[in-house]
Amino acid sequence: VANGGHCILIPRFTPQSYAELIKKHKPNLIAGVPSLFEALLRVKEIEGADLSCLLGVFSGGDSLSVELKKRFDAFLKEHGASITVREGYGTTECVTASCLTPIHKQKEGSIGIPFPDTYYKIVKPGTQEEVPYGEEGEICLTGPTMMLEYVNHPEETAQTKQTHADGLTWVHTGDLGMMDEEGFIYFRQRIKRMIVTNGYNVYPSQLENILEGHEYVHLSC
């Protein structure tokens, strides 16, 4: 909007009306949660749409399964788009997105790399101890969009915003993830949703990926 673009607001969302608006306005950018993309794959109103207008499609707000991404990428190609879904990540505590899959390189299961002015690290849950590349832990981030505080909630603020040994103040997101050696971030799950069984950490998103990879399973949750 600040650069002269138009933002199309939808008073009440339905997959059918959303599909019709895409065909009518031919937007360049679409951002949504995974359930939006799943819904668009199912509605007949999107059939025959020319999506060559799209320059970017962004997914966030929840885990995008590998299977759904493959299906929607194929859908985009079939409808004339030359792009694929790019995953991103953000939290309320940093205002908006702070991590995005670059257009020139994508890695399966990754939510991308931090914005240029934002830094990420992965720490052992419940500590400030940074873990090695490839090891899972809590996602922490810092940057210019970091919140000041939870208003009138100093204890919650102190738990979320912590000053580490490097002198920087970091937001502890409560999300599990990892970072590879190229700086790509992988979101796993909210820490509270992790299942521990027989000493192993099991994440619902991993189970969903396995289930949705079966030819007879359309959607799992």
Q: Language-model features: where?
A:
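AMP-binding/adenylate-forming catalytic core of the ANL superfamily
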Residues: I30, G143, L148-E149, L168, ...
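Glycine-rich beta-strand-to-loop/alpha-helix junction loops that act as flexible
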Residues: S59-D62, Y89, T142-P144, N198-Y200
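A structural signal for short hydrophobic beta-strand segments in well-ordered beta-sheet cores
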Residues: Y120-I122, K161, D175-M179
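Conserved ATP/PPi-binding loop(s) of AMP-dependent carboxylate-activating enzymes
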Residues: I113-D117, E129-Q162, Y200-V202
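Acidic-histidine catalytic/liganding microenvironments
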Residues: V43, P154, H214-E215
